[in-house]
Each structure stands twice: as structure tokens, then as C-alpha cells.
């Protein structure tokens, strides 16, 4: 009655099976610390080009005391800004950051930065690329800051190109 081709059925079944696959995420718990600035979570947020030329926001958060730091940068070459941010946090708050936790961002895990971390006895923990679930505190904090900055811009009826100022104001009110 029906003319069925086995190749077509097999292909449809493969498509159905592929659609039902779930993303497997490592659920290894992150080590908890009680000391502020023991671990600093870092992420790069891609934005639209700002009025001052920046296109990326380098964001760092301490999950223990929920302290945020941000630098607006014009390229993904953020190592000098990252070093300056870490040194400013350590000098201002008289502490030593022991672990820097980043996602697999290529601009944050280069050899020069790894050597800098090793020389200052700081562990650089890099998660798998394109897996934001493994960098949870930084991703959540980045989403919060982006949301608050967007509300500030829309509430004041300002152009979107002023996002660096809105993000810095959001961090100021959060801290």
C-alpha cells in the first residue's frame, strides 16, 4: 500500500534522536571559600561599540562579598586591563587573590598571562570553552549588570552607545 524507503526512515530517526540529545554539563561543585577575594571570577561581555570606542566589558566578581569590578575595553586583548584590575583590587583592599577563574576565552588564557599568574603564585582556573554554566558566578553577575545598565539607559532615554557609563554606574550602586 505504501512505498517506504528504509533510508528515509533511518534518516528521520537519526534526526529525531539528535534532537532529543541533551547537553551534558559537568556538575562538579566549585570549592567554597569563606575569605573574600580568595577567588575572582572573570568574564568578557561583548557589547555594541560605545561612543568612546569600547566594544567589550571585562568583568570580575568576588562571589563571597559580591564585589564587582569592570573595565570597558576596545579589543579582546584585555591582559593589561586584567592585570591592572587585579593589582588595584589587591592594593586597595590589602589582599591577595589566590585563584582567577575564567571561561575558555582565548584572550584570557594566553601564555603571558599564565606566566604572570604563576610568578605571583595565583592559580589560573580555566573552564571548557563555550560552556558558560561552568563559570556561573561571573555569568550571573554579568547578566545582572547588563540588565541594570539597560534599565538605566532606557529609563533616562539615553542612546545605547553610552553603555560603559551605565555599566559603571550599575556596579557603583551594586557595590
Q: Where are the model-predicted features located?
A:
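Retroviral integrase
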Residues: 2-147
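Charged alpha-helix within mobile-element recombinases
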Residues: 138-175
Amino acid at each position: 500500500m505504501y512505498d517506504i524507503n528504509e533510508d528515509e526512515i533511518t534518516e528521520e530517526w537519526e534526526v529525531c534522536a539528535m534532537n532529543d540529545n541533551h547537553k551534558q554539563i559537568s556538575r562538579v561543585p566549585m570549592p567554597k571559600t569563606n575569605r573574600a577575594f580568595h577567588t575572582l571570577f572573570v568574564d568578557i561581555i561583548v557589547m555594541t561599540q560605545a561612543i568612546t570606542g569600547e566594544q567589550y566589558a571585562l568583568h570580575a566578581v568576588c562571589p563571597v562579598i559580591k564585589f564587582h569590578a569592570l573595565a570597558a575595553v576596545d579589543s579582546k586583548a584585555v591582559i593589561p586591563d586584567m592585570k591592572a584590575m587585579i593589582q588595584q583590587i589587591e592594593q586597595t583592599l590589602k589582599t591577595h587573590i589566590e585563584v582567577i577563574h575564567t571561561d575558555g576565552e582565548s584572550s584570557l588564557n594566553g601564555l603571558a598571562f599564565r606566566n604572570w599568574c604563576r610568578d605571583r603564585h595565583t592559580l589560573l582556573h580555566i573552564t571548557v570553552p563555550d560552556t558558560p554554566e561552568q563559570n556561573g558566578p561571573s555569568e550571573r553577575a554579568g547578566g545582572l549588570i547588563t540588565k541594570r545598565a539597560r534599565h538605566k539607559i532606557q529609563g533616562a532615554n539615553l542612546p545605547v552607545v553610552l553603555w560603559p557609563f551605565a555599566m559603571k554606574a550599575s556596579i557603583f550602586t551594586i557595590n
